[in-house]
Amino acid sequence: LSAVGLTVVKAPPRKTCDLRDMDSTIALLNKAQPDYLVNCAAQVGSLNYVTNHAGEVITNNARMILNIYEAIKNLSLSTRVISLVANCAYPATTMEAFKEDEWQNGPVHSSVFAYGSVRRFTWAVSKCYEMQYGTETITLLVPNMYGPGDSTDPDKAHALNALISKFLRAKRNGEKSVSVWGTGAP
């Protein structure tokens, strides 16, 4: 983004800016005054994590989404939001072949119910804030995300993060095998 002349402001870590807190969210956006905001903020983890922490996952993610849109509205910013909706928002029946026009044609899979549901909520919030307040949003359906800041905790990490971490740890420790959970089926 910097290469095309855009100023990139990376959100600080949660300990210095908690998007679940409205005052923190307003302070961040008031200081940054972004033209575009790529919303990657999420509390998410492995299938076990999102199931065992379903209430926290849906509450904290909904709070972050609402705080971002409310802060933009309250500060009268003309920020355009780019929201990422993970493939877990697709219906359970389409887990093998994703088609963009079918992403809301049924309930999300029970293994990702909390996170998949709140990703759909992201889309609904963006549409409502655009209708009433003119907040422009581009929603992208993404198959997966990986990068700096992701968890490498084996009980919390997504599959790709967990696998990379396990293989690196095994290589570093000279281990001859790596434990991989499950079959890959949802």
State what each model feature region is:
Residues 5-27:
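Adenosine-cofactor binding site in Rossmann-like domains, unifying the SAM/SAH pocket
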Residues 12, 37-43, 81-87, 139-142:
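SDR active-site strand-loop-helix element
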Residues 66-113, 138:
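Conserved Rossmann-fold NAD(P)-dependent oxidoreductase catalytic core, especially the SDR/UDP-sugar
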Residues 93-101, 124-186:
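NAD(P)-dependent short-chain dehydrogenase/reductase
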Residues 114, 118-121:
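Active-site helix of classical SDR
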